[in-house]
């Protein structure tokens, strides 16, 4: 270890070795100031604040995203969502894709798509929507950080404020909306209390807890998609039947639902005929 005495001090305070190393790497201990910052960061982590917020940035696929409590911490499952979306776009054979990222949060999904498409020589344009001005500020910051300019940010509740001229012209709608029901949220890890509640918890529908936002997105997406356009959407592990039924009822074809790496139902894929 770079500084075994400090690592030992942090572990004794209650951090695990991995977190101690991360914090030391991030804040350093070269002088009195950085040492004080390191100890403050350790206190925040020991108080229960997620490491991603304490450090202030976190890797997501090929990006290093700035993160703070204004936005949700992107999950590993959401990295898989990006992979599925890329595969769908490749299958759609679109030369200059128009992508809409609903509820963009930190910008993770849409910006990762732009970056990885650019690596493949594909020039895409992105519209990133979120109803939270705070989230949009973080997403803008992340776009600037990574030099991703083919993106417009719009404050919008789902499709509400999307430019009407895009109706029927979008190649990919991608979304990681709130999908946790209030009852389930109450039973989850209290550390989630640090994250923005509105990005996690959704209203229940008559049949399915936490399904209200997904229902709205699936129902409204078809009209915005171009013929052959794809909807790729993350959802909760108890919502497979609900998302499949909603997508078929909305008029989608090639409707499928994929498991995540842990084997849970997680990603809806559907195509506009």
Regions found by a protein language model. Name each.
Residues 1-17:
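Non-catalytic nucleic-acid substrate-recognition regions in nucleic-acid-modifying enzymes
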Residues 18-88:
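Conserved AdoMet
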Residues 64, 125, 150-152, 253-256:
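Conserved beta-strand segments of alpha/beta enzyme cores
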Residues 23, 48, 78, 109, ...:
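Residue-level signal for inorganic ion chemistry
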Residues 208-270:
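Conserved Class I SAM-dependent methyltransferase catalytic core
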Residues 178-213:
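Mobile active-site "lid"/loop adjacent to the S-adenosyl-L-methionine
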Residues 80-186, 216:
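Conserved SAM/SAH cofactor-binding pocket of Class I
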Residues 113, 191, 217-221:
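Class I S-adenosylmethionine-dependent transferase superfamily signal
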